[in-house]
Amino acid sequence: MSVEKKRQSWHWFLLVGLEKRIFATGLDNIKPIANICQVENGIFIPNMEDSSFLEQNFIYHIMQVLVKHIDTLRKYTPFIPQFISHEHIDASCRKSDYAIIDLLNKSENKSEEMIEILEYVHDKCIGKSDEETQLHLKMRVFGGDVLTNERAYSAQLALHNGTSELDRLQCVIHRPEGLHRIMNHLLFIYQQFYKVTSAGEPGTLSHLRNTVGRVDVHGPDEVIQKYRSHYAFVEDCLDAFIVGAYMHLSGTQNLQTESPLQQTMFNFLSDEQKYTFIHKLAKDILDKYVKTDIHNIRRKTDALDTQSSQLKDMYCSEKMKYVCPICNKLYKAKGGMKRHLNKEHGFSFELGDENSTTEKDHIATYRASFMTCALLLRDTNDAYKMGDGNRITVNAKFQMLLARVGKHTKYQLWLFRYLAYIKCLLTPQMAYEYMWNCSANLQGGLGRNIPNDNLVEILVQTVKKKVYCQGANASYASVRKAALTTQIQEEIKENLQSQCDKKKSGSKRPKANKTSDILEMVSELNAAQMFDSIPGREFRSFSGFEDLFTRINVSELHSWITENRERLSYEVLN
């Protein structure tokens, strides 16, 4: 630093191109899947099939924990699938092709510069036909965190009155990418289940953190800055809760003793019988200690969809009023018609809430809710590792509901838009490719995918190293040149290493052995009777803790989805 060149804050935009690995050329690519104004709100809410699908994935993760930490169950390891398979497993194992397209001297924080970024994308990255004004139907996905999505979306809205797709910058579609989705879900977990004031209450996350001395875990305030340590702690806590649940279910005092839940004549049983046993054990743990009721949300949403459809049928377009089907009385507003039907004809528009009069065990609810959220976090992370677009999409429905509970309004909105693109706004071909190309594989191989925004973060860190190497001589021009030659330099390095028969440096971090920490947490959980059912008890710091999904006001959620469906119908031009 000198008098002429003081410390500066540079805001540049790194544009990375990633080639799709999964295609759906056999699907229709002419018109959108559905008119978003005509679909029911229920398609954005998890249904019975989604819940069952998620539960099967949870059972898989529980089985993996059991055979990993419990000595007497390790013999079942060969009979459990190594991974959750999907129809594009071979394509997800292929190494991804990507390139740094450019480093733009633009800041996404400024509206006019965000417009210029999108103009650059349309100019350089969108294929044109012979006539310059005509664009191919193929569009590009513009991914990033929700702030990047929001700014790009707002830039498009600013030019909504343009005469062509090019003028409106409509040839990019937006996608909230995985790393920031996982980060937001992890932040939600800490906001709901971690309080420093609960450190003296055995069984809470804060108490477990102090028990095993995780000094790098500080709660929701530092989740983003210290993501890796906070993520690892939640993973370890989940393992401890699952192991503790197994001990409570089997009635064992320690993990070395034989459990009464054993198969006799193990060596004479078929592989299917062995798998059935460990699967049932995991399912029993899920049903007794984890499972929460989400079906009530779907039931109420379907009821509201039916009411909305009935009221829509009462509207007369000629009279521009609602007509009562019983007495033919006219009303201008939907609210007036609902009040009339309720008062004069006994129609009920209230959703019956099932209020239990029995006293609840709020500590058991805390346990079940935490295990549900932590399993959802693990399954979403695993889905991105495996490049499983279907799992990523199903989990987005549950994450959207939890984002509403946590008042993460931007993530709720963008998860809804993500689902809307897949369910309605895109053509079948575009929706399929949009859903399945959410990850990149830098090395090639099974389970080595990372979210697309994680790839960008890695490349950003690489470019920052170039900036630091240049020191006071760094400028936009020099850093841009370094960024555009980074991949070429890496290829030259790899070729030289190959010719010299030099071993490549490892691309994996060594795994720390956390068994002792997990066993210590299990002891604390058992001592706190976390797996018992004792009505009336609660944590002082989490007074009256309720199941997360029961906190959702379904009527308000239904209205919110309806409002945003209508908004997308005119903001996104098809």
Residue ranges and their predicted role:
Residues 1-574:
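Buried hydrophobic core signal strongest for RNase H-like alpha/beta domains in large
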